[in-house]
């Protein structure tokens, strides 16, 4: 067995403004922590998952096929590991189904921790493709607007057509986020299945304009323009 390597990944907000599936930001102070160490055997195993209270989590499984941390870590280990075993401990700091990127935080923290076991770790940007695999299990879709900011921090534009390449955006001075969390849970995969499959041409034009305006406002450090673009269509 090796020493434990610990990694923290912050919570995140996806679908920022009109940036559905393509624009996300990281939140400071709240997140998941994953510990990883080398063990005898092969592949990834999950020793325990603990909740916000520090106790064994009542809902999250240690089954490696049902946990975003182990799914992401296994995808990484399959390509960069040495064939040995890795044990994970997951400590949840993000509430489940809260809209704060809980599954993404676990996936990112796991990949970063396992990456730390390598003699020559990969760069952070190279880890995104593996974290996405964990998020894909939870949400049923290929998008990075939670995993990318959780991995890289800050505000990130994640066009699906360019993945795993993403674009980090500057945040204008004076902008902060106030988070209001209703006492309810929404399953991401179920919520996505309820979405309309199409929109009108005018909605699409309006959406493109607001998203482009938001990106331009960030680049110009124009907080007032950012505010004008943060509305739905």
Describe the predicted segments one by one.
Residues 68, 109, 210:
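Charged catalytic carboxylate motif
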Residues 123-233:
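ATP-dependent small-molecule kinase catalytic core of the GHMP/sugar-kinase superfamily
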Residues 43-49, 100, 168, 188-193:
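Short, charged, solvent-exposed linker or helix-capping segments at domain edges/interfaces
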Residues 104-121:
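Active-site-proximal alpha-helical scaffold in enzymes
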Residues 98-105, 201-206:
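Short glycine/threonine-rich catalytic loop with a Thr-x-Gly-x-Asp
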Residues 48-52, 110, 224-230:
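Short, basic/glycine-rich phosphate-binding loops at helix/coil junctions
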Residues 1-98, 116, 120-122, 153:
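ATP-binding N-lobe of GHMP and related small-molecule kinases
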């Amino acid at each position: 067995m090796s020493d434990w390597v610990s990694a923290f990944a912050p919570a995140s907000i996806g679908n920022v403004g009109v940036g559905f599936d393509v624009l996300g930001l990281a939140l400071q102070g709240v997140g998941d922590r994953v510990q990883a160490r080398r063990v005898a055997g092969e592949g990834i195993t999950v020793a325990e998952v603990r909740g916000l209270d520090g106790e064994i989590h009542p809902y999250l499984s240690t089954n490696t096929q049902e946990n975003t941390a182990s799914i992401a870590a296994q995808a990484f280990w399959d390509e960069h590991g040495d064939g040995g075993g890795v044990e994970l401990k997951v400590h949840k700091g993000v509430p489940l189904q809260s809209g704060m990127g809980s599954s993404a935080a676990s996936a990112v923290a796991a990949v970063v921790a396992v990456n730390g076991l390598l003699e020559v770790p990969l760069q952070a940007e190279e880890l995104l493709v593996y974290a996405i695999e964990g998020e894909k299990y939870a949400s049923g879709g290929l998008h990075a607007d939670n995993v990318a900011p959780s991995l890289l921090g800050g505000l990130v534009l994640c066009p699906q057509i360019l993945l795993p390449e993403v674009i980090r955006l500057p945040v204008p001075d004076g902008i902060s986020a106030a988070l209001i969390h209703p006492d309810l849970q929404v399953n991401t995969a179920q919520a996505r299945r309820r979405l309309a499959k199409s929109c009108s041409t005018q909605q699409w034009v309006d959406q493109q304009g607001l998203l482009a305006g938001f990106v331009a406002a960030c680049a110009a450090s124009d907080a007032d323009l950012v505010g004008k673009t943060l509305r739905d269509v």
